Amino acid sequence: MQVLSSDDLGFLKSVILEAGGMARRIQQGDFHPERKEDSSLVTLADLEVQRYLVERISGRFPGIGFIHEEAFDKNSAELKTNSLTAVIDPIDGTAVYSMMLPTWSISLGIFRGTRPLYGFVYSPGCGMLFHNDDENAYLNDRILKVDRNMRVDSETNVFIPGELFSSMHIRYRGKVRNFGSTALHACLVADNRRNRALAFYGQAYIWDWAGAYPVILKAGGQVRYLDGGEVDFAEALRNGCQLTGYAAAYSKDDFDYVRSIIEIIR
């Protein structure tokens, strides 16, 4: 069932593109990252992009709910039944953003109840806009369909978050990479015919996954926990908005192989 019209989706695409331009202008200027209570970084771009997205989206969709990373009480997060919620990560990859590197992204997911329906992940520095509608996933308006029977060799890529490098065993002969953005890593899996991406492994928060999750599914990829369980966003809400374990976004049909690649040892 169609929830948003093509005009609505076009509006959201234009808004995230505008937000990306704003973030790039701030990055190219003189800014100074600050530390949050958990010691993670926050920049002016995180705050300004989030403010802009909330303002524009609430103007288009009166009554829509919001879950976002900055200045947000995780204990107040709700995904109301049959209601729309915009889940926002204004700068996914603030650390690489603050290093003046290009591999950060802006992530926006539109949920109905606890189900993520539409995703938008924009990497201005890489020139990549991933999104989906009710039929397909797209990269820069080109339809994406994963190759579920992809060949795995020394040039195949998997993406792993930095915190896992010291707490895992890996059994894999290809490339292991980290670009600094959960949403971008996950969306790259949807483009595996071109970039040879097999999987992204990560935990993170709802806002890190919200934009990428529906894109991956519409491209024909899959997301599940490493123990085989389905990702339950209502359960993640009850866990302080964090996924309850490590999940894999993957493009190959053989999940047993995908999860055999890494063993978390901590």
What annotation goes with each model-predicted range?
Residues 47, 70, 90-93, 124, ...:
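Generic detector of well-ordered alpha-helical packing
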Residues 79-138:
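DPxDG-like acidic metal-binding loop motif
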Residues 69, 122, 200:
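Conserved residues at the C-terminal ends of beta-strands
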Residues 148-266:
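An extended, acidic
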Residues 139-146:
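A structural micro-motif at secondary-structure boundaries
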Residues 1-91:
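N-terminal subdomain of lithium-sensitive/metallo-dependent phosphomonoesterases centered on the IMPase/IPPase/PAP
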